Regions:
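Surface-exposed, glycine/proline- and aromatic-rich loop segments on solvent-exposed faces
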Residues: 2-67, 123-144, 149
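Accessory, solvent-exposed terminal regions and/or long lumenal/extracellular loops of proteins
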Residues: 1, 134-369, 373, 377-383, ...
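Extracytoplasmic
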Residues: 7-9, 22-24, 100, 196, ...
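A mature extracytoplasmic/lumenal domain signature
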Residues: 16-18, 31, 116-119, 159, ...
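A cross-kingdom signal targeting lumenal/periplasmic-facing segments of multi-pass membrane
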Residues: 35, 41-107, 290-292, 298
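Coil-to-beta-strand transition motifs
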Residues: 9-11, 22, 107-111, 150, ...
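Long alpha-helical, hydrophobic tracts
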Residues: 74, 78-163
Length: 407
């Protein structure tokens, strides 16, 4: 369900995961007023899918740097500032320019980095060296953001083309109406329900995030560091994590999975929706006179705030319809899960030895975190991680022949 609301005006978009024959489909939804023909519309399912992808829980990936190189670099900086090109490693080069690569990951069709920087000219140099085209003289603008303590989201397009799909499911129905009641009727759908039902609510509002007033709104567990193999079973991980979270809240909570200004994202699971897409979803307050109407939204004042809510409900635990309120809270939140890839080089400096020892504790913490989040058996997790009894792996020690011919 997508709810676009400002004041008393609401546009409700109802998607469906109906799998049967179209002739068997029936939908009954209470509405606050008699709807005229012009208040009813058939929407584009791809736009709802886009909104779902944009706000979906996401994996982010970090890659550990060579501890020997980092130790060498730190020692050098204590004595003399390195000239450009002293270190070929990308991380070290960035540091030489006062730029820190805070995160590196691939999400969807984008290769993404999150950067922080000390000086705008160093950041501008790094961006140009790495083929992120910035206009000449961008240093001043970059500097204004740095003074605000902001980070920089940079992306390159992954050119692999997504498969094109047709309408495999029923298209969503939309209705536009005015009512002081900001609510979503769910009770009728539970009458003949076979077990608990799953519901996603995407709220698009002008001022801030949306929450339920008659049920607790709880943030989904987030920012957890989990084992690398979860990347291959992320759907299973999230399914079981959500189930565990629902049980911990006694099956009575509505979970916040995403809250963000539509004008940007960090990281982006998918690009923000275009102005045309948002208007199709009922964001009627967009300034249509603003130039570049088909571009992604930029500027302040009209950008909708996106709230993604997720609940598993039945009549026993959700006896009332969902009642919402819009708040002035524009703080960002997302379901975000971290994969940290260890460095696997053969260098055997003292920093590397200490680094390898530290991996054991890190793996143990990742495994216990995963078990707590999902209810998965810890021994099964250990098996999937390919660790020994002390949480070490084969890559934690340098083989004798790797020491013979160091590069």
């Amino acid at each position: 369900m997508v709810l676009s609301r400002d004041g008393d005006r609401t546009v409700l978009t109802m998607g469906s995961d109906f799998k049967g024959e179209p002739s068997e489909f029936a939908l009954v939804v209470p509405v606050p007023t008699v709807l005229e023909r012009d208040q009813i519309h058939v929407g584009d399912p791809k736009i709802v899918e886009h909104l779902d992808a944009y706000s979906a829980p996401r994996l982010v990936e970090y890659f550990d740097a060579d501890p020997c190189m980092m130790a060498k670099y730190e020692a050098m900086t204590r004595n003399v500032a390195p000239a450009a090109g002293v270190l070929e490693d990308a991380v070290s080069r960035a540091k030489a320019l006062g730029v820190t690569i805070e995160a590196s990951y691939t999400v969807g069709e984008y290769d993404i980095l999150i950067l922080s920087a000390k000086q705008s000219n160093g950041l501008e140099t790094w961006l140009n060296e790495n083929h992120y085209r910035v206009p000449p003289g961008a240093s001043r603008v970059l500097g204004s953001y740095l003074k605000q303590g902001m980070k920089f989201f940079v992306a390159k397009v992954n050119l692999k083309e997504q498969a094109k799909t047709g309408f495999k499911n029923l298209r969503p129905l939309q209705m536009a109406y005015e009512s002081p009641k900001f609510m979503l009727p769910i009770r009728l759908g539970m009458v003949n329900a076979d077990g608990p039902q799953e519901l996603f609510v995407y709220a698009l509002t002008r001022d801030g995030r949306v929450e339920t007033t008659n049920y607790r709104t709880v943030k989904i567990p987030s920012d957890a560091e989990i084992p690398e193999y979860v990347k291959e079973v992320f759907a299973d991980f999230y399914r079981d994590m959500f189930r565990t979270a629902v049980r911990k809240e006694d099956n009575t909570a509505v979970f916040l999975e995403y809250a963000w200004d539509m004008g940007w994202c960090d990281p982006c699971a998918s690009e923000p929706l275009s102005r045309d897409e948002l208007r199709e979803l009922g964001v009627f307050w967009l300034d249509e006179s603003q130039p570049g109407a088909n571009r992604r939204i930029s500027g302040a004042g009209t950008m909708p705030f996106v709230t993604r809510l997720h609940l598993r409900y039945d009549a026993a635990h959700f006896p009332e319809d969902l009642v919402f309120q819009q708040t002035a809270d524009r703080s960002n939140f997302q379901g975000r899960y971290i994969l940290r890839h260890p460095w696997t080089g053969a260098d055997d400096c003292s920093a590397a030895q200490e680094y390898r020892k530290s991996l054991r504790g890190r793996r143990e913490k990742q495994a216990t975190t995963l078990a707590a989040l999902t209810g998965w058996n810890l021994e099964d997790i250990r098996t999937r991680m390919h660790v020994r009894g002390d949480w070490s792996t084969e890559t934690d020690s340098v083989k004798w022949y790797q020491k013979l011919w160091k590069k």
